[in-house]
Amino acid sequence: MEYGSTKMEERLSRSPGGKLALWAFYTWCGYFVWAMARYIWVMSRIPDAPVSGFESDLGSTAGKWLGALVGFLFMALVGALLGSIAWYTRPRPARSRRYE
């Protein structure tokens, strides 16, 4: 077997745990996109609360953006964790003992 060849019979496949991790990551990505679109849709319909000066309220524009940022960061962190698990369980070629 030549290293780097791309014959069909040499194609690597994932283990069942790796497939589960990959599908969990794909599902999370879909949910992430849906949740962000839903958040934008819902928050765009809520009127801003009048706030004067440097005080802030969660109903203000700054509060909406802060809530969106915190939600985005949390969901991105979970997505990064699931993505790293899917990456760790990827199929790898068997190591050859070429230099022994």
Swiss-Prot record:
One of its GO terms (biological process) is FtsZ-dependent cytokinesis. Residues 1-16, 86-100 are cytoplasmic. Its main location: membrane. Residues 38-64 are periplasmic. Keywords: Cell cycle, Cell division, Cell inner membrane, Cell membrane, Membrane, Transmembrane, Transmembrane helix. Induction: Constitutively expressed at low levels in mid log phase, in high (10 g/ml NaCl) and low (0 g/ml NaCl) ionic strength medium (at protein level). It is found in: Cell inner membrane. It is a multi-pass membrane protein. The chain crosses the membrane at residues 17-37, 65-85. GO terms for cellular component: cell division site; plasma membrane. Bacterial adenylate cyclase hybrid (BACTH) studies show interaction of this protein with DamX, FtsI, FtsN, FtsQ, YmgF, DedD, FtsA and MalF, as well as weaker interactions with DedD, MalG and PBP2, but this assay often generates false positive results. HAMAP family: DrpB (MF_00857). Belongs to the DrpB family. NCBIfam families: div_DrpB_YedR. This is Cell division protein DrpB.
